[in-house]
Amino acid sequence: MFGASNNEELKNVIKNGALLIDVRTPSEFADGSVKGAINIPVDSIEKQINKIKNKNNIVVFCRSGARSALAKRILEQNGFKNVVNGKTKNNVNTCLVEV
């Protein structure tokens, strides 16, 4: 289930209280994000692992899906198992509204 790009699965993860992480830059995040999301830029995600180490389900997203794919890979390499690439901010927002 985790890691699939299917929006139904993404909606289920969000419904079950996943941590939403916007991996864009702080300035992009300041211009608007997803309600309830935290900002951890992809280039500093490894340094901030301790902030999220106790989270079971995580959704990462960005502007195009490229940085979130990288963030997902980094988190998985650091032992996280339930990481979903939500791809874009707009995609996650759409799924959040539909939950």
Language-model regions: role of each:
Residues 1-19, 26-57, 66-99:
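Rhodanese-like catalytic fold shared by cysteine-dependent sulfurtransferases
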Residues 61:
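Short, surface-exposed ligand- or partner-binding patches at beta-edge/loop junctions that are enriched
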